[in-house]
């Protein structure tokens, strides 16, 4: 297995206006370990307790501050932060100069940022990124490692947190932080503005060093970290994606832990966009992970490491012409030993919002479903893909000279046809999608194809015979709701393999129902079982656990602010009415929930573990909730609530699995993926390892 390190680099910025300030005390310099840096700091010290009173380091720092480039390296903890607080400040404290200061600040939402202000020079910069910090892990305050680089040569201000570049902003008018007019105060835990402390902080600064130099990316990478997390998928890895969403985890019978995810190239936007499905695996209980590969991908658009704009003008830009995959789910078939992965498939330019809801994309002929195609220049779908991939003309009732191969590529007379690939960039303030000169095989899902599928959503299946080391070509599943209804939407996460039979089940949803896809022959054929739900427009993403033989409990997202559940007592054939869990809150739009049945007893009872945000005000406050199962009636007592991080820190889609050593692996979106302010964040899908004792304290 190709093992790799987890230091990563990313770049995202938010430009704004103003905000901050603070005050003074004393310090002692320690010998601190900051990796293989090429120069010595002009100041270093620690540790400092911040309790709503600033610490003045002016006499120790200001006379040494010189030159036009600086670096600040800081290790700090803040598990009970104020809503807005300054960690470090340089300022002109005299009357009339309240807007002359530099500040490194944080918010209690996990945002980190800087302000650089000089009223006389007309400089007013604010750069920040939300969802950048950790507050606590396993009940203890987390030490965050912050590096801020002010580089006069490149005219950039760059922030790294916990080994991740969270923003790098280039400006036309660069102001060195050392050249702010009239600096006379250097403070920890506040900024001194006109003699008053502003943005007081709570927490601790364990170590801090300042350098009269802009240190390099390579030097930053040598600074030791105390991260509680890993990155399985990261910006710039083998996927060449800058963004990832919708994680899954699944522990195979061999002990290998498999993960899949959306590798997103057009920011964090859902389809329509360019999105592939990537996978990685671990053979050592999640300690190290293989280099990602693709389980499903299209080639109509190039895999590009693009930094999507986060400003209000451009952040809503979406790739409009690419085909995509989205929302994967995994199950292992114990009979054949193969791994099955399903995902939604979207043709070029199609997403949930604009998919044709009244067309399956298939035509039924003599009890068989055939994929429909429209030829360029036609007004309707006059062709179908028949046996052996032959493209059949429905008007003449004759085969054509065209065929579709197992990759859904178009051939004429046995010869592959091609289209020109697209690349994207931002030019003159707008998104540009342009041909790049590379020819790729023509595919019926591509916008430039001679033949195109119906612009609706589909479900695809791929399998792996070697536990995720490689994947076969995907195949479309047939429609389950008839010709005149679009496909159901896959519930991302895990499928369910029943213990005492060969049955496999995946949960999907459509308007007003959960539609369970069931296979009893290792995924060769599928049937459906429908269960009505009292929501017409809910994204009812569901996950299943088998409480005991043939008894399945499904937990799912709703529009009620609660997690719903239903039960089947006949291996998924029929389902109970919907009930709701008390004691766990979600927003009115809901969030995906992840669930597993734990293999060991907890407090002498069988147990279920849920992963969910527990908040009415956003996708935040992530918890693992342990429920103890009462055998008499299959009711569940939700006894233990474990906080992933602070209640105000983001937690959106998640995946959990029981590792071979009985720990719990958690891969989750550590940000509020619903918030328009938190679009297009890189390296926020993070993996942690928890022991069951952590959850039940």
Swiss-Prot record:
Residues annotated as binding substrate: 245, 557, 619
Any Pfam family the entry gives: Sialidase
Repeat positions for BNR: 280-291, 462-473, 517-528, 566-577
Domain of life: Bacteria
Active-site residue list: 270, 541, 653
Keywords from the named record: Glycosidase, Hydrolase, Repeat, Signal
Chemical reaction(s) catalysed: Hydrolysis of alpha-(2->3)-, alpha-(2->6)-, alpha-(2->8)- glycosidic linkages of terminal sialic acid residues in oligosaccharides, glycoproteins, glycolipids, colominic acid and synthetic substrates
Example of a GO MF term: exo-alpha-sialidase activity
EC numbers, comma separated: 3.2.1.18
SUPFAM superfamilies recorded: Concanavalin A-like lectins/glucanases (SSF49899), Sialidases (SSF50939)
One GO term of the biological process aspect: ganglioside catabolic process
Signal peptide: 1-29
GO cellular component: cytoplasm; intracellular membrane-bounded organelle; membrane
Family under the similarity heading: Belongs to the glycosyl hydrolase 33 family.
Name of the protein this chain belongs to: Sialidase B
Organism this protein belongs to: Streptococcus pneumoniae serotype 4 (strain ATCC BAA-334 / TIGR4)
Gene this chain is encoded by: nanB
